[in-house]
Amino acid sequence: MINRKILLTSLLLIFTVLSACSREKNTCRVVKISDGDTLTCLTKGNKSIKVRLAEIDAPEKSQAFGQKSKKTLSDLVYQKNVRLARKGKDRYQRTLAVVYYQKQNINLEMVKQGMAWAYKQYSHDPIYLQAQENAQAKGIGLWADNNPIEPSQWRRQEKINMAFDYQTFPSSISLFPT
């Protein structure tokens, strides 16, 4: 009986220590806002982490509502200690995470305020789509625009525009030499 109590107490202590270490590892201070869905934070050991907010896609900086989205994220978390619920890495090796400030889901808050879309391609939680539908119905944030363009569509169009701009292509250069 005593051995069992010692074992249970030991296991409880180990899990408590591991939990505390995990919380500390996932806590950081936001030191930079890149745009409405990307931030940089520092851990207690001064390790820099670039974080891409999971489940959402915010307008690009040069897109309509891009600067407002960036400012909204800044107002919510800049210079604040946040907790990261990590989801892995994206193709640019940024940490994908749900960001929490004082138990508030910041990713979800960005969608609620109409400053980001639920990222349908990568979203696994229906609360983001519900929040988007609510913001859209109320005309909040980017939903006040007559024709809001999803960032993924906007990026595709920008690539096409940059790939070949007939307006600026020099007329002295022949595309089809004879």
UniProtKB/Swiss-Prot annotation:
SUPFAM superfamilies for this protein: Staphylococcal nuclease (SSF50199)
Superkingdom per UniProt: Bacteria
Enzyme type, top EC level: hydrolase
Cleavable signal peptide: 1-19
Documented EC number(s): 3.1.-.-
Keyword flag Repeat: no
Disulfide bond sites: none
Family matches, as PROSITE patterns: PROKAR_LIPOPROTEIN, TNASE_1, TNASE_2, TNASE_3
Keyword Mitochondrion annotated: no
Record-annotated active site: R52, E60, R94
Gene Ontology MF terms in the entry: endonuclease activity; nucleic acid binding
Swiss-Prot/TrEMBL keywords: Endonuclease, Hydrolase, Nuclease, Signal
Family: Belongs to the thermonuclease family.
Protein name: Uncharacterized endonuclease HI_1296
Organism: Haemophilus influenzae (strain ATCC 51907 / DSM 11121 / KW20 / Rd)
